[in-house]
Amino acid sequence: MQQLNRRSFLSASAKATAGLSMLPFLSKTSLWSENMFFNISLAQWSLNKSFRNGTLDPLDFAQIAKKEYGISAIEYVSQLFSDKADDAYIRELKKRADDHGVTSVLIMVDREGNLGTTDEKERAQAVENHHKWVEAAKELGCHSIRVNAAGQGTADEVKDAAIDGLGRLTEFADKHDINVIVENHGGYSSIGTWLVDVMEGVSHPRCGTLPDFGNFRVSQTETYDMYKGVEELMPYAKGVSAKSYNFDKKGNCKEVDFARMMQIVKDAGYTGYVGIEYEGNELGEKEGIIATKKLLEKVGSKMS
């Protein structure tokens, strides 16, 4: 009964947060505010190749999302600008997002140490390394940072370590009104039941999940059912990553049944942001983002 109450609380919190973050303006090409149960955001990772090779400037991300794709909410990726992310840079990111009327949703944080490492000193350092990103998220107006619950050892050993690491980071983030959310991102974290156990172990309203449609590869030889995994993680979700790859002639993703996935998302009572995260190799980054957006709008408009 306690678990059900907690899930109900998280669902209600997600709805309240989504309601507060609704924007007063719409893109001419987007139907989401009026006709869909969720909001569309753009994950910076969808353009990671262009940011990495210098074709695009991370400072222009908000402008690109709004003007190129008609999307008014963005999800940052720390590794694409971590080498220059001092206070002045973060302030400039915020200014540019504000100038273009774009909401900063979250920061996906990588390469700051493993929060699930069984080495206590390394885990403590990893927690501390994430502090600056909590502060950056607060400055940008994000509601969360996305972290990884990685570590070496048995499933139980890493679970216990992740509960400790996430718990300590969440206590810090709570003081800044920031959520700490974990993505299924390989290893044990791609096992839905394992990550649920971690969430229950942390048992903090600011610690949740970021279900990703595609990241359910546990190892080179083991995968977890993506639909089962998303369903298991949704009760704790404070965000959703709509991972897309390649598309058929009808505009559907070949690898992921978006209609089925979004029904799972809706059935969980989620009404927040669904982030476009394109990783295909048949379309370019721009075309892949547009295709994913069209698919989300097509599926979403039929469900609302």
Where are these regions (language model features)?
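Active-site groove signature of glycoside hydrolases
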Residues: 137-156, 176, 181-185
